[in-house]
Amino acid sequence: MAPPREQRGVLAQWRFGLKPREEDHCTVDLPVFEDCAEVWRPHGRLRYGKLGGAGFIADDELMMADLKLSEYDFDDFSTTSEEAYRRLTDYARASGYPFVLRVWNYFSRINEGDGDDERYRQFCSGRQRALERDWFDEDPAATVIGRPGQSSRLQVIWLASKRPGRCLDNPRQVTPKRYPREYGINPPRFSRAMYWEGARGELLLISGTASLVGHESVHDGDLAAQVAEIRRNIDSLLIQAGDVRGRSIGYQTGAVFRVY
C-alpha cells in the first residue's frame, strides 16, 4: 500500500458526460444523456494513494477504490473476474476499511457467449471462486453494467467502510445466491441493498434493480410498466431499511438514482 497523500473537499465525484480533468483518476466509458455530476462530500481528513494495483481515496469513515484489469493478462474472463475479487478482498482488508458496502462492475460484451460461456456467467463464476476463499461477512450491494465496444477491461469500483452495514433482501425477489441453475453454474453474489450508519448520517445503497419479480423480468416491451415495477421494488427495499432503522424511510431530498 503506497503512503496516502492528503486531499481536500471531495470524497468522490461522478461526472457524467463532463470532460475529464487531467488529474481525474477513474474514468468509465459509457454513453450519457446529459452532463451532470454527483458529488460525495468527505467526513474528516481526506487521503488518497495506491493499494497495490488499485487507486483509492478515503476519509475517516469511507473509502472509494478503483481497480482495472485486462482479460488479455489472464486465461479467460472468469479468471480475470476471480483475480479482481481476490485483489478487492485483499486490498479492503489491508486498507483498514474491511467492510465492502457497494460494488460497481463494468465490462463490455456482457451477454456474449452461449449458456455457461456467457460473459456475465463467467464473471459470476470467477467472483464466486474468489469469495469462496475469502467470504464477505455481508454480500455488498452491487451492479454489473455493460459498457459499449470491444474493450478487454474489467473495471471494479467499490465503496468500503470501517464499520459494517446491514444487507437487505427484497421479499418481492429471490435472494441472488438462491437463483436457479438456469442462471449459471454460480449464482450472482450481492445483496439487494446495504444499509449503513456513520457519523456522517445514513446511507441506503441499492443494487442495480429492474422490473424483476421472483427471479424473472416482467412486462417485456412495456417501458411504463417496467418503471412502475422498479418503483415497487425500491419501495419494498425502503420498507426493509425502515425495519432495520426502527422508523420509516422515504424518498428524501438529495436521493440519487442512476438510470442505465
Predicted features, each with a name:
Residues 1-260:
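N-terminal presequence-like segments and the immediate start of the first folded domain
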